[in-house]
């Protein structure tokens, strides 16, 4: 990207900040979301890319190579997976909702809080699922397969592309 857009700013999980920090354009990239899954040959991993212009999300792409799923969201166009429009769930009663989650990095302060919330969610919802790649779990919310998602300490590269995808999917609800 730096060769094609030398005046843009890039924030990447793996390589940090690059380019012009005051650029109108910023790319937020997670080149491998679900690293542990990838290393264990589990298909739940993805590449996630978001483009911001003047601080506003404009384009998002999430690709799950093993599943051959390409999620694309564009302002004014909506959100799609492999050219099929995404629509979020209409469920709004918590006891009927299927919720996704991710486990935070083990931390003596956060782990007990997370486990308490997880226990409450397991009691209050139709079920909780953990698949190991935040971007793809959140894509399940955009698809209407999950009704919500919670996780602690997510970073911009974990959620930038998928949050935009979710917003565009919500527009077509």
Which ranges hold each PLM region?
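Acidic beta-strand-loop-alpha-helix segment within the catalytic core
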Residues: 49-138
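Alpha-to-beta junction loops
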Residues: 143-148
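Short secondary-structure boundary segments
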Residues: 14, 103, 152-154
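Flexible, acidic active-site loops/lids enriched in D/E/S/T/G that coordinate Mg2+ and/or position polar
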Residues: 1-54, 61
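Acidic donor-binding loop at a coil-to-helix junction in glycosyltransferase catalytic cores
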Residues: 157
């Amino acid at each position: 990207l730096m060769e094609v857009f030398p005046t843009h700013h890039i924030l990447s999980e793996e390589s940090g900040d690059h380019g012009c920090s005051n650029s109108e354009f910023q790319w937020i990239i997670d080149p491998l979301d679900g690293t542990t899954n990838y290393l264990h040959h589990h298909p739940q991993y993805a590449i996630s890319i978001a483009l911001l212009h003047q601080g506003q999300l404009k384009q998002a792409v999430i690709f799950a190579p093993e599943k051959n799923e390409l999620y694309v969201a564009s302002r004014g166009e909506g959100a799609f997976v492999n050219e099929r429009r995404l629509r979020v769930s209409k469920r709004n009663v918590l006891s009927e909702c299927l919720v996704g989650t991710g486990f935070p990095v083990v931390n003596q302060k956060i782990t007990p809080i997370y486990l308490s919330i997880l226990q409450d969610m397991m009691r209050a919802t139709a079920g909780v699922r953990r698949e190991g790649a935040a971007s793809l779990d959140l894509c399940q919310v955009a698809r209407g397969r999950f009704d919500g998602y919670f996780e602690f300490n997510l970073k911009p590269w974990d959620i930038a592309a998928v949050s935009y995808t979710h917003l565009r999917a919500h527009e077509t609800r």
